[in-house]
A protein has these predicted regions:
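Extracytoplasmic/secreted proteins, especially bacterial periplasmic and envelope-associated proteins
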Residues: 42, 46, 84, 106, ...
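Extracellular ligand-binding/catalytic regions of CAZymes and related secreted enzymes
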Residues: 21-27, 42-43, 53, 80, ...
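A glycine-rich, often tryptophan-bearing local segment used as a flexible ligand/cofactor-contacting loop or short
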Residues: 94-191
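Bacterial N-terminal signal peptides
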Residues: 5-16
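Short, solvent-exposed loop/turn segments at secondary-structure junctions
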Residues: 36-37, 94-95, 128-130, 198, ...
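Active-site rim elements
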Residues: 34-37, 125, 166-171, 176-181, ...
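Catalytic beta-strand/loop cores that center a nucleophilic Ser/Cys/Thr
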Residues: 52, 58, 159-245
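Helical hinge/lid and interdomain linker segments adjacent to catalytic or ligand-binding clefts
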Residues: 26-123, 127-131
Length: 303
């Protein structure tokens, strides 16, 4: 039986959700968008609202040229000031093919320097599809929508040990239809996942399998059982890059004209808020909401 609890109304949310009180020195966030195979415009609005509603962040948005055939002159006008922000939330996916859209090299270098010098990054869902030919980006994401020849893959066995599948072996990336599934916390001691139940339900998500990449320095926080390939797939992980911290979540699927069910999940919202704070500061002080999902019950919140 699919159990769903939906929290409605501002008063109910404030009482039941466990929102942190607004903080005086808010964390500065830049969301980058402009291209994605998902509904990035609606997704950015929802990500921004989730972060701002926590009372912990100020959020700006920087949008790239939205046309894959954009001219050099159009791209020359896009020069985000990453250094102005404590953390960048990446909602951009210009395509997984090596020939797909890259950022101008000047911007890529600025982003690399930003993270190397201590800037935080949050990669949301399809953001790890992008930039197959950008080596530094691949180091930041660890795993992405890359084929078996690109690099190793990681799965979690039934003893909760991370298993490396060598380059050239295993599966190419893919996913089945969106469905409800159970998330499992692998590291309950990390600030992002602290206090979460060992298992909790997440709704109507796209569960990706067979991702490949450098897979270096990855610390996996959560995983989920893929019924499509009968393996445990990493869902959330963190990677150090220089002095910076990168948090990747595979949650947050939002298709064009599709429901925003995944982003209304209290579990997703908690991961996003905590992951963004952690990427920026190395801490996660956002309390576990009282309406957090359980092992058997999905919990959703209006945004």
């Amino acid at each position: 039986m699919r159990l769903i609890a939906i929290v409605l109304g501002l008063t109910t949310v404030l009482i039941n959700s466990g929102f942190a009180a607004p903080v005086q020195n808010k964390i500065s966030v830049l969301i980058v968008d402009g291209m994605n195979n998902h509904d990035w415009e609606r997704g950015t609005k929802l990500l921004k609202a989730i972060l701002e509603n926590s009372g912990m962040f100020t959020v700006d948005v920087s949008t790239t040229p939205t046309n894959k055939d954009a001219s050099a002159e159009q791209w020359a006008k896009w020069r985000p000031n990453f250094a102005k922000y404590q953390v960048v939330v990446n909602n951009y996916n210009g395509g997984y093919k090596p020939t797909d859209t890259r950022w101008p090299r000047e911007v890529e270098k600025a982003f690399e320097d930003y993270v190397t010098n201590g800037g935080g990054v949050v990669m949301v869902h399809a953001a790890n599809n992008a930039f197959a030919n950008w080596p530094a980006y691949n180091e930041m994401i660890g795993l992405g929508w890359r084929n078996t020849n690109f690099g190793p893959s990681l799965i979690i066995n039934d003893k909760e040990k991370v298993v490396t599948i060598p380059q050239g072996e295993g599966r190419n990336p893919g996913h089945g239809k969106e469905h409800d599934f159970q998330m499992t916390v692998l590291d309950a001691n990390h600030p992002i996942t602290a206090g979460m139940p060992k298992k909790w339900m997440h709704p109507m998500e796209q569960l990706t399998h067979g991702q490949h990449g450098p897979a270096k320095n990855m610390h996996i926080l959560t995983y989920a059982w893929s019924k499509d390939v009968n393996e445990n797939e990493p869902m959330d992980w963190v990677i150090p890059y220089g002095k910076g911290r990168v948090y990747t979540t595979m949650l947050g699927h939002l298709w064009h004209d599709g429901p925003d069910t995944t982003m209304r999940c209290v579990g997703f919202q908690t991961l996003l808020i905590r992951g963004t704070e952690w990427a920026a500061t190395g801490r996660a002080t956002y309390p576990l909401p009282k309406d957090f999902p359980t092992e058997t019950e999905i919990r959703m919140r209006e945004i």
